[in-house]
Amino acid sequence: MSRAVGIDLGTTYSCVAHFSNDRVEIIANDQGNRTTPSYVAFTDTERLIGDAAKNQAAINPHNTVFDAKRLIGRKFDDPEVTTDAKHFPFKVISRDGKPVVQVEYKGETKTFTPEEISSMVLSKMKETAENYLGTTVNDAVVTVPAYFNDSQRQATKDAGTIAGMNVLRIINEPTAAAIAYGLDKKGRAEHNVLIFDLGGGTFDVSLLSIDEGVFEVKATAGDTHLGGEDFDNRLVNHLATEFKRKTKKDISNNQRSLRRLRTAAERAKRALSSSSQTSIEIDSLFEGMDFYTSLTRARFEELCADLFRSTLEPVEKVLKDSKLDKSQIDEIVLVGGSTRIPKIQKLVSDFFNGKEPNRSINPDEAVAYGAAVQAAILTGDQSTKTQDLLLLDVAPLSLGIETAGGIMTKLIPRNSTIPTKKSETFSTYADNQPGVLIQVFEGERTRTKDNNLLGKFELSGIPPAPRGVPQIDVTFDIDANGILNVSALEKGTGKSNKITITNDKGRLSKDDIDRMVSEAEKYRADDEREAERVQAKNQLESYAFTLKNTINEASFKEKVGEDDAKRLETASQETIDWLDASQAASTDEYKDRQKELEGIANPIMTKFYGAGAGAGPGAGESGGFPGSMPNSGATGGGEDTGPTVEEVD
């Protein structure tokens, strides 16, 4: 059976959770970590995802991709993409006006869209869940920042499809966190909760009213480009400048040194959340020069002061939009790793006149937790905890069409509860106008040129008539994912046309997605083949070394004779030497080599064990003989199942 999970697809870290038996389980990955770095690395031999990718970032900076969430659903000429591309050690290039990353993989130059990179992270989370649950996982609720626009949401949904998942729903991160906060507070009367969600790359503030299991979002605001990464950037720039001042060496173009500096900066930032000073020590950072310095919390706060202060603007905005005074907020819930920064906590507390934030939920796991609850609801879970739970979310940005003079005419104002449907009647601007161009925008500005164009379509075949006579009904329909459908109907002729906003500028076509799905399968198969190759290599290595250890046992030579012992020692050593020189050999080569070695070893080992009436005295110490006894087949060696034993007549 397939089980549904909740996935928090984060800028820097991702998290997966599952709801069953009235509780949410955050699922740890194969390293035992409850969050997984949103990193993908490409090498000459393999693709790495998660911890393994992040751990080798310093030695492979150009081919280690991170922060895909900062590129997803955006255009290449977006100023924020341009700024980010300067910081990234990997190459970001333009393809059809969209950003794609360029890396070297298995000796070839490859390009990947942000959707593909995100899909690789999602497939890692899917695999983590499957390993834990022991069953296939196809359905998922995936979270996005509340302030993500239509194309960013659509692109995230596409990433899920490429990863081979059915995305049940895209939900907003602060709303998911609110579920985590409110799930056990069913008996409490209506209260207003402000979710302050500052993560690795994005920032959201949502104000909700929670009453008996009904979670109603009143207003939302944020910045899809503000988070811990920006604080790290400030620290890296500061440390690089200090290194230059001390050594007269500029490391700004050395990606490996910058990566090591970034790792140290991130570690220092975390340390400063619990202590007022920390030291940074990096041996041989650049041209053999060490870098030792110390950093105080006050200095860090000064470096990021403007960024920290800017987090209060969205707080003021949601209060204004929901027409509430700060004194009417009952709980402030901090979500996202960056809310551990003491200065952020103090700013929020001071803004609310000294009110202490609620610390009842884990800031790293709350979003995945809420997503898992929503996944359970959408797949019909009958738990009493989720039965009366109702989520009423909102559209983060106003939606409308362009009317004469480039004016933005809003059909759905921001913070409208979704799903929602709204129609308005328009007419022609000129006499005998044969058609109209419906251009759909999102944003708050009066003129459309200052807003974001989502898509456009033609409604043609309007019969000749004076201006203002034809009646054209335009309908906006937002689904529960926050994704928009627009239709137009000319009343006189009944002619209609519609568009699901697929944002041709930022969205993948169906063919692209299908191609990426099949490529993802190919990469997955490559990964499995590589894992099999490494296993065959390790098996042979383990076998050869165990043979070598057995030869050194005191009784070995007297039981098998000098010649056989010498022959086995030579064969084992030759295999070990061959392995050292053949790190990139194929699976079959390793298996053939194992068979060869077994051909020499098995008769000798049979003699050794036979002479000792069962297991020789050294068998226990060396863990037993790990290879194959005669007729046990080549694959028996080195498996975790232990020695292969067969009955002797």
Curated annotation (Swiss-Prot):
Family from the record: Belongs to the heat shock protein 70 family.
Gene3D superfamilies with a match to the protein in the record: 1.20.1270.10, 3.30.30.30, 3.30.420.40, Actin, Chain A, domain 4, Substrate Binding Domain Of DNAk, Chain A, domain 1
Statement: the UniProt record of this protein carries the keyword Membrane: no
Subcellular location: Cytoplasm
Statement: the UniProt record of this protein carries the keyword ATP-binding: yes
PANTHER family xref list: HEAT SHOCK PROTEIN 70KDA
Chain segments carrying region Disordered: 608-649
Keywords, ordered alphabetically: ATP-binding, Cytoplasm, Nucleotide-binding, Stress response
One GO cellular component, as annotated: nucleus
UniProt name for this protein: Heat shock protein SSA3
Top-rank lineage group of the source organism: Eukaryota
Comp. bias regions, Gly residues: 611-626
Note: Present with 6440 molecules/cell in log phase SD medium.
Phylogenetic classification of the source organism: Eukaryota, Fungi, Dikarya, Ascomycota, Saccharomycotina
Organism this protein belongs to: Saccharomyces cerevisiae (strain ATCC 204508 / S288c)
An annotated Gene Ontology molecular function: ATP hydrolysis activity
GO biological process, one term: protein refolding
A Pfam family the protein falls into: HSP70
